[in-house]
Amino acid sequence: TWELLLSKILPYIIVGYIQVIVSIIVGMAVFKMPFLGSKILFFVLTFFYVVANLSLGIMISTFSQNQMQALQLSIFLILPSVLLSGFVFPTEAMPSGFRYLGECIPITYYIRLSRQIILKGGGFEFVWKDTLALCVYIAVMFSSSIVMFKKRFVP
């Protein structure tokens, strides 16, 4: 079943990379955003973020009865993800409960490692903890998704 899950997400990995590349190009061209760190490191670590998000999507699909329910749950998760990730408000200024919730969201780690690599020129030694967190998130979500998928669809 992991082969089935992988075949389902591969096209979305490509789409995720296209979105990131377009965002970086627009940021650099239009907003004069500097890119101080390693582009190779950034794009390698972007893979983990894209896969983390896709693993969340797969988990949502295993819980959902239909496509509309999956879409509604995904939309329901977007706003808290953005607000708790440190994208809008600094996580240091959040109450500890909200900060803890933000640590359960993959975008939190991706924002930190993106800022470190792109804006500060940091290397892997500065982002390995965030990368590890994304890897743990992926492992937990994929494992849980496979278990849920088997319970639901495999007799």
Question: Over which residues does each language-model region extend?
Answer:
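Alpha-helical transmembrane segments and their short interhelical loops
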Residues: 1-74, 79, 128, 142-143
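Aromatic side chains
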Residues: 12, 17, 31, 49, ...
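Hydrophobic transmembrane alpha-helices
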Residues: 13-14, 46-51, 73-85, 91, ...
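Short, functionally important structural connectors and interaction interfaces within domains
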Residues: 22-23, 27, 63, 81, ...
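Membrane-interfacial helix-loop-helix junctions in multi-pass membrane proteins
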Residues: 34, 86-140
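Short cytosolic juxtamembrane segments of multi-pass membrane proteins
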Residues: 147-155
